[in-house]
Amino acid sequence: MSLALQTQGFSKNQCVTGLRAAVGILEKWQANSDQACRLLRISRSTYTRARQRDPAWAVALDADQMQRISFVLNIHATLRLIFDNPQNVYGFVSMANDNEFFNGRSPLEIMAQGDMISLYETFRRIDALRGGQW
């Protein structure tokens, strides 16, 4: 993690906006609440509040949590570049994958282990699918 990300403060509005976007994506990926909480490193109550979309609700998240949100958003953006079909955009993450890294597990299963390395490595492999698109 870069020093700039570690020291950058995020407003509660930025935190809520990012968290709600990530939770919405995770729901479309068919992540259950336990998987989402482990992946984002948030409590069950924070997850529930994010889903309720109460406009008065605010939350402060740390740099690690914001980086996790960033990975979810970037994985989603990459999948939208790779696939035209919404079923693939939202279904890919929950499908079993026989790639050596995934070893028959879904990307969601790997990410839901909860450690940053699993999240990063999953992002890296999905991002590599873009190949020469850039």
Task: Locate predicted features.
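Non-transmembrane "mature" sequence context
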Residues: 1-134
